[in-house]
UniProtKB/Swiss-Prot annotation:
Single GO cellular component term: cytoplasm
Annotated EC: 2.1.1.199
Xref: InterPro entries: RsmH, SAM-dep_MeTrfase_MraW_recog, SAM-dependent_MTases_sf
Source species taxonomy: Bacteria, Bacillati, Chloroflexota, Chloroflexia, Chloroflexales
Disordered, as annotated region: 293-313
Catalysed conversion reaction: cytidine(1402) in 16S rRNA + S-adenosyl-L-methionine = N(4)-methylcytidine(1402) in 16S rRNA + S-adenosyl-L-homocysteine + H(+)
Enzyme's top EC category: transferase
Organism of provenance: Roseiflexus sp. (strain RS-1)
Protein name as catalogued: Ribosomal RNA small subunit methyltransferase H
Gene giving rise to this polypeptide: rsmH
Keyword NAD part of the UniProt annotation: no
Positions of disulphide bridges: none
Length: 313
């Protein structure tokens, strides 16, 4: 296996983050069917995570297909290194953001590739590791960084943004109608003491919205908004898509899995614009969703939407 200088399975991240990395890749068969991996092909997984999609692509492109795996999370890369070790030097792993996929691919010798996949969801491991601060169902630091070296945490935004900016952020990225009430409640709470844990924030949001109604937790949209802002997710996606198209050889395919309407809208509009410009042919006229069986086995797949397109010129 080829790895970037200094890469190892023991990154300098908190020891509690080295719990067994678990993540079930969504729409696995559909991604492979969309990309059509073949022997000798070169592929990029821009969100390699635990290596689930990557392993399937490597199997389908045996015996000599190659894959570049990119991830900003060192725990994910460590898990990918272990899972993909049997594929030896067919695999190259690099730590970085898919926002810089063009540069990372060029540096690693992956240009004019046959396929690229992005799975934009937060992994089960990240959600279920309290220290990562993604879940409102645990007492944990209000972090939410996918890259543990990133400078801004959710706690920083919650405790420092002016009320109007906080309301705008929650409305824009969480599509939360109660954003003004939530922002007001957060500001009132932080005037008494800083809001530093996930359960604190969840309780503030729940009270601001008048308690829980229905199956969806009242804090769901606020947590989504903060996670998107902390990790600059939408801007990263907008930056990455044109680079991915440039990386594809004629006939090469891109498969993008989105998990909420903001992401899916960006993907849909980009693919349509590039198709109208004659650079892409859209394979999936409508986004592919997980089967009922997959949704039952993996409830987190319910919101997944896969779009596939092929480079034509």
């Amino acid at each position: 296996m080829n790895v970037e200088p200094g890469f190892s399975s023991q990154f300098s991240v908190p020891g509690s983050w080295f719990l067994e990395y678990h993540h079930t890749p969504v729409l696995l068969a559909e991604v492979v069917a969309g990309l059509l991996p073949r022997p000798g092909g070169r592929y990029i997984d821009g969100t390699v995570g635990g290596g689930g999609h990557a392993a399937a692509i490597l199997e389908a492109s045996s015996p000599d297909g190659r894959l570049l795996g990119i991830d900003c999370d060192p725990a994910a890369l460590a898990a990918a290194a272990a899972r993909l070790a049997p594929y030896g030097d067919r695999v190259t792993l690099v730590r970085g953001s898919f926002r810089e996929i063009g540069q990372l691919a060029a540096t690693s010798g992956f240009v004019q590739v046959e396929g690229v996949v992005l799975d934009l969801g937060v992994s089960s491991y990240q959600l279920d590791t309290p220290e990562r601060g993604f879940s409102f169902q645990a007492h944990a630091p209000l972090d939410m960084r996918l890259d543990p070296d990133a400078p801004v945490t959710a706690a920083h935004l919650v405790n420092n943004l002016p009320e109007q900016e906080l309301a705008d952020l929650i409305f824009r990225y969480g599509e939360e109608r109660g954003s003004r009430r939530i922002a007001r409640a957060i500001v009132e709470a932080r005037q008494r003491k800083p809001v530093t844990t996930t359960d604190e924030l969840a309780a503030i949001v729940t009270r601001a919205l008048g308690g829980q109604r229905g199956r969806i937790h009242p804090a769901t949209r606020t947590f989504q908004a903060l996670r998107i802002a902390v990790n600059n997710e939408l801007a990263s996606l907008e930056a990455a898509l044109p680079q991915i198209i440039d990386l594809l050889a004629p006939g090469g395919r891109m498969a993008i899995i989105a998990f909420h309407s903001l992401e899916d809208r960006i993907v849909k509009h980009t693919l349509r614009a590039e198709a109208q410009a004659g650079r892409l042919h859209i394979i999936t006229r409508k986004p592919v969703e997980a089967s009922i069986e997959e949704q039952r086995a993996n409830p987190r797949s319910r919101s997944a939407r896969l779009r596939v397109a092929e480079r034509v010129s």
